[in-house]
Amino acid sequence: MIETRYIPKLGRSVTRLGLGALPMGPLQRKLTPREGAEVVRAAVASGITFIDTATMYGTYEHIALGLRGWNGTVTIATKTHAQKDRSMAREHVEKALKGLDRDRIDIMLCHCARSAFTEELWGPSLETLVSARENGTIGMVGISTHSIQSVRAAARHPEIDVIHPLINMKGMGIIDGTTDEMLEAIREAHAAGKFIYAMKSLAGGNFVTDREKALRFVFDCEEIDAVMVGMVTPLEVEWNVRFLSGLPVSDELSEKTALQSKVLSIVELACIGCGECVEHCENGALSIVDGKARVDHGLCILCGYCAPHCERLSIRIV
């Protein structure tokens, strides 16, 4: 059985292992809605009851199709990237309701990512989400962030219910400190009553060759209520569920979900074309084209040496 955590404000429990929907969508693996739906259905059929997505991920259709006809309760979290824009935030709420085919959004976050959580940038969107929570359209509101200071600011904010921070064993992607400092901020936020669900435990797939250690590092932190793990095949769902439930994992399943099944992907929305990855690629597989990093998959050997040099965590192995 997958471990669960109870969320008082929703009146239900969620599995600590959640399905992260970013990698399956057009920004990364580019699964069709039907292919993505197979992953979603495999996840819920395996007992996963928590899914994370966002307006910009383009995966609402994948999720809605995967849940069509499913009778179990599934909690979905999504995000708005609207800054200083109440109108856009309202549009994102309506888009989520329609796209996910729901009459209520369980959790909706300000998609801060690498931007600071400040009243100037995010106040209007947060106010919009809070209003939607008050009228029953949204269950809980909060932020997603790669920043320690933003976690701390959200922990002090009286309207924040949920914090979705970046945390992994090497601190890859944290923009303003170390793993230990982020863990300290997470513990403070949890003590303040915030529901914490983590992202990037595998650093965008870069720790897939050491996934057992990477997953245990995050799941063993009691202050982290749940962890989103990106999965793009039913076999990956099976591996994660079995491993985190303490069930035997066959060598065959491990081999089928290992590095050989992955590809290097650049998140273009995050990439600024700085060229650091190109400089550190010893195989000539990376170049800058039209201001963005590009991968020659014929030359890429998935060594992952480029990823630590990307300050924006734009390089993913999916």
Regions found by a protein language model. Give the residues of each.
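N-terminal binding-site loop/beta-alpha segment at the start of enzyme catalytic domains
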Residues: 1-74
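Beta/alpha (TIM)-barrel catalytic core signal, keyed to glycine-rich beta->alpha loops juxtaposed to Asp/Glu
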Residues: 4, 113-262, 268, 276, ...
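Short, acidic/polar
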Residues: 29-43, 85-101, 145-153, 209-217
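Conserved, mostly hydrophobic/aromatic
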Residues: 7, 19, 43, 51, ...
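Active-site groove signature of glycoside hydrolases
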Residues: 97-116
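Acidic (Asp/Glu)-rich catalytic clusters
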Residues: 8-14, 45, 63-74, 94-103, ...
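Iron-sulfur cluster-binding cysteine motifs and their immediate structural context
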Residues: 55, 276-294, 305-318
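A short, structured active-site edge motif that brings together acidic residues
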Residues: 74-85, 108-111
